Design a protein with these regions (language model features):
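Surface-exposed helix-capping loop/turn segments at secondary-structure junctions
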Residues: 55-56, 166-169, 206-213
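Acidic/His metal-coordination segments adjacent to aromatic residues that form catalytic metal sites
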Residues: 105-119, 174-189
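Substrate-binding groove/exosite segments of carbohydrate-active enzymes
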Residues: 7-161
Length: 214
């Protein structure tokens, strides 16, 4: 929308209603002697609360999608604050329920007006499904949940392993790129290699839970 340069809109006494599904009832905030650190912490908690809706959204001022990379970090912060495990589970199930025919997990999901997986696929974002599942089990052990979602996690690992040669070296796929950072002015192969090692260790622990020896 646009207006005439000779006219402008003016709002008098505007009000804003904020929404969150974050539960403050059991939340005990941390206290720091350093006032700057305290302010950073308080703003961080408020931002997490603003992103805590039907899912962990990608920021209240952004596109409000559910991104797997963001979910991993938001879930970790959630365990140290509001500790709403049901919301983490909901997000994991959303991703698990909307894989491609090949079994790939989308990097993000639109949740309004209906749940729709995006057609963006990123190397480490699919792997972070494993990380988020592992972190949840570390915070709140749930073998039944692991058994139910393990096949999806294993599928992500198997798909990704096809990108490595017999010497364990990553062969990048432009259709399944390593993200790491918005900049494309540097080689991301080493970062992808490190991410795979990081997630592989977590996957092995999940495999032990379900007693998968393969």
């Amino acid at each position: 929308l646009d207006t005439s340069p000779k006219w402008q809109a003016v709002f008098s006494g505007p009000t804003v209603v904020t929404e969150t599904s974050a539960d403050y009832s059991g939340f005990e905030p941390m206290r720091f002697e350093d006032p700057e650190l305290q302010k950073i912490y308080d703003i961080g908690v408020k931002t997490l609360a603003d992103c805590t809706q039907d899912v962990f959204e990608d920021g209240p001022k952004r596109d409000r999608r559910l991104w797997l990379g963001d979910l991993r970090l938001q879930a970790l912060a959630n365990y140290a604050t509001f500790d709403q495990t049901d919301l983490v589970k909901r997000c994991l199930y959303l991703f698990a329920a909307m894989t491609t025919e090949e079994g790939k997990i989308s990097a993000n999901v639109f949740v309004k007006p209906e749940n729709v997986p995006d057609d963006t696929f990123l190397f480490e974002y699919s792997l972070f499904f494993i990380s988020t599942l592992y972190d949840l089990h570390q915070a709140h052990p749930d073998e039944e949940l692991i058994r139910e979602l393990y096949p999806i996690a294993k599928k992500q690992m198997n798909i990704t392993l096809k990108m490595f040669d017999e010497n364990g070296k990553l062969n990048p796929d432009e259709n399944y790129p390593v993200f790491v950072d918005w900049s494309n002015d540097f080689n991301k192969d080493t970062a992808g290699q490190a991410e795979m090692i990081y997630v592989m260790k977590q996957f092995i622990e999940l495999a032990k839970v379900v007693r998968d020896s393969e």
